[in-house]
């Protein structure tokens, strides 16, 4: 299932939230009825919190079924909320505070449950990132941009990336993430940082409400969500 939506009138929903194959984190600002829809479409348990008192969960955090990386600026109360949520849902997820100067991990890491791409800006943390997420990685940029996380969205079936990603980069991403297909596209009527506009797993996707019909078709194809 795929739906289009806004979070409090905002279409860059990937900046504000994080979804994996097994859980989702959403900011306190998301309305309860919207949150229930997220649970239904993505078929995962979800919780609401802020990270470092910020609603930018998707920019600050990155995770998959194996692990969750949060910035060092996260509060002890927020860590406790995440741990309680994981325990309540019997989720065995490695939770790690990464002590990096650049705290926008969601913008700088693209992951699924098979591999991850790490921006060159975080290459010194490659080993700990691999250990927490439980996958092998590739280090590099694509589309001449270091923001490999916000410029892509990946599931265990497919991946959508920035439209200026070249053919060699597409092959590299395909190999690292171990998916059958990587497509290029935009969302929210021309936004190239597709990760900032889309939440997805193999069961469904939630897309920013400004996304056009042609964009939606490319998203469905890349993520293998065509019924």
Swiss-Prot record:
GO biological process, one term: cytosolic ribosome assembly
Domain of life: Archaea
Keywords in alphabetical order: Initiation factor, Protein biosynthesis
MF GO annotations: ribosome binding; translation initiation factor activity
InterPro entries: eIF6 (IPR002769)
Family (UniProt): Belongs to the eIF-6 family.
Function summary: Binds to the 50S ribosomal subunit and prevents its association with the 30S ribosomal subunit to form the 70S initiation complex.
NCBIfam families cross-referenced by the UniProt entry: eIF-6, PRK04046.1-3
Name of the protein: Translation initiation factor 6
Organism for this UniProt entry: Methanococcus vannielii (strain ATCC 35089 / DSM 1224 / JCM 13029 / OCM 148 / SB)
Gene of this entry: eif6
């Amino acid at each position: 299932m795929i739906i289009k939506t806004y979070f409090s009138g905002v279409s860059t929903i990937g900046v504000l939230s994080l979804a994996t194959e097994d859980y989702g984190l959403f900011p306190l600002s998301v309305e309860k009825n919207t949150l229930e829809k997220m649970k239904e479409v993505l078929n995962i348990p979800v919780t609401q919190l802020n990270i470092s008192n910020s609603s930018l969960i998707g920019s600050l955090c990155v995770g998959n079924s194996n692990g969750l990386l949060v910035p060092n600026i996260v509060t002890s109360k927020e860590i406790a909320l995440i741990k309680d949520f994981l325990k309540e849902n019997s989720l065995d997820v490695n939770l790690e505070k990464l002590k990096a100067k650049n705290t926008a991990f969601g913008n700088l890491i693209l992951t699924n449950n098979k591999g991850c791409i790490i921006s060159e800006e975080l290459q010194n943390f490659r080993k700990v990132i691999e250990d927490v997420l439980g996958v092998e990685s590739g280090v590099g940029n694509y589309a001449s941009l270091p923001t490999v996380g916000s410029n892509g969205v990946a599931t265990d079936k497919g991946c959508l990336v920035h439209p200026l990603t070249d053919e060699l980069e597409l092959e590299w991403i395909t190999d690292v993430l171990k998916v059958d297909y990587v497509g290029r596209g935009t969302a929210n009527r021309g936004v190239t940082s597709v990760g900032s506009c889309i939440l997805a797993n193999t069961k469904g996707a939630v897309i920013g409400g400004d996304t056009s019909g042609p964009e939606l078709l490319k998203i469905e194809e890349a993520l293998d969500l065509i019924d």
